Amino acid sequence: MFGSVGWGELLVLLIVGLVVLGPERLPGAIRWTTESLRKVRDYASGATASLREELGPEFDDVRKPLAELQKLRGMTPRAVITKHLLDGDDSVFDSLTRPLDDVKKAVTEPAPTPIVNPELAKPAEPGPTRYDADAT
């Protein structure tokens, strides 16, 4: 249930709980939370067991399509093509992506800095400032 929660997140939750509840009420809150989670887990496993008892062999008939749907949920278009059309041979995708890797490398490399020729850039000649009566 909390498989994606790491130690860092648990530490943050503990510190927030310590600040919000205080050191006196925090152990009781942790105890209540663990008991509640245990009750929910027992209730869910009990519901599964009671369904299995009531449905009998039909439970497996219901469970098989759900397991197939679960497998399909994780399928990406690339995985579907590899499995069904290419019989698991993934080398076609490697040959297609190899030229793209060269393009990515060329795009991500910084462009060389242009060399500026100082002889081409001449300052303006001193003299009177030009005045355009139509522009003002």
UniProtKB/Swiss-Prot annotation:
Keyword flag NADP: no
Gene Ontology terms for molecular function: protein transmembrane transporter activity
Biological process (GO), any one: protein transport by the Tat complex
Record gene name: tatB
Location relative to the cell: Cell membrane
Record's keyword annotation contains Transport: yes
Annotated protein name in UniProt: Sec-independent protein translocase protein TatB
Transmembrane intervals: 2-22
Disordered: annotated segments: 107-136
Organism this protein belongs to: Mycobacteroides abscessus (strain ATCC 19977 / DSM 44196 / CCUG 20993 / CIP 104536 / JCM 13569 / NCTC 13031 / TMC 1543 / L948)
A Gene Ontology cellular-component term: TAT protein transport complex
Membrane topology summary: Single-pass membrane protein
Subunit structure of this chain's protein: The Tat system comprises two distinct complexes: a TatABC complex, containing multiple copies of TatA, TatB and TatC subunits, and a separate TatA complex, containing only TatA subunits. Substrates initially bind to the TatABC complex, which probably triggers association of the separate TatA complex to form the active translocon.
Task of the protein: Part of the twin-arginine translocation (Tat) system that transports large folded proteins containing a characteristic twin-arginine motif in their signal peptide across membranes. Together with TatC, TatB is part of a receptor directly interacting with Tat signal peptides. TatB may form an oligomeric binding site that transiently accommodates folded Tat precursor proteins before their translocation.
Keyword line: Cell membrane, Membrane, Protein transport, Translocation, Transmembrane, Transmembrane helix, Transport
Gene3D superfamilies (UniProt xref): 1.20.5.3310
Protein family according to the UniProt entry: Belongs to the TatB family.
